[in-house]
């Protein structure tokens, strides 16, 4: 049976996914009834961690089992969704299959969720420091009890920048390459890294493969996310696009992460503030270098500006996705014999 596909169908699917996520997000009722794709991947990761990462294993065995676990995590969910994609395009009209793929793919992006969680920190900050600490504790791993208002605002802006890359740009980029299956591949790797890719006695060796693969799959999206932030800053009068470019070139590589420094540096430069710096995790102070040249004493107003920049960057990304999918469709029509 011949399969007739729209050209640029992955781009069209991705554009629909981005729009659905921005408008509706992932409904809480679905979370309560069937869970979320990330939760399912998390269960698979947890099961493999319990079965393959035994305390009695030697270091070489833990390294090996970590690679085995990542092979399963990266391929099984992706292959399952890929089979569904093939079935959909065999059985459904291409436009309907693209729409269905976009709705499915929207669950793998976090535009609306990230906006709501970071916006909650801004709202809570107007009510008091305890409320702001409680709100930011939902989105950061550091100890909120040690944070003053400026540190809470920095933590929220840093989370916004970093998660714009790995929560939105990365899954949409992988979706544009491989459809929902591509996004599932990325989310599987990213979820595994968040669960087992830590430098702890239990996961330092078993999680090595997860951490390194996550760094690799996030490499293009982290750079692209910085581009979106830079372009968004160029369209906003109260942002410093030149500063974003300067700080991006100077500080992106100074971050502890090979990827997170890119969107964070672009965000810091555009806002004219300093991000990163020393922070405390479970009572242990981590002396991280500063990113940016401006003020470190951020206010709720700075967080609101960061949210506005984030929203503009998401809009630019969505507009480019739509434009590219339309251009590919028209180019394909022009090439078809009349």
What are these regions (language model features)?
Residues 194:
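Solvent-exposed interhelical
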Residues 1-184, 189, 197-338:
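Hydrophobic alpha-helical transmembrane segments
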